[in-house]
Amino acid sequence: MSEKVPTTTSTPTTRILAIGTINPDVDQAKVFEILPNEVRETVDLYLDGKIDQWYSLQDRRGVVFILNVTDPTVAHEMLEKLPLGQAHLMSFELIPLGPLKQLRRLPGMTPKPQ
């Protein structure tokens, strides 16, 4: 007897991965001038529970945030309010994250009613 593999069901977005990099041809002196305020405001977002985790990029200047936000538009607006965003010195790539939906294909998993 073969088990039915559930069809693909949607999974919710539970976090946003935000990869921030300094824009090309930016004067680094401007970045360093703004950086202390950027760090303080980023810490505030962390303490407010908006940023879950943060890391630095190893291959170039930039940061990675795992945001406790589910809407990319909200994430974009939040990050653009940071000092480097307001100065148009940093840009973010936003990637919605969710549960590993492939786990639904494990034997014995049954689709949940929607």
Say what each PLM segment does.
Residues 1-114:
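Conserved, structured core segments of small domains
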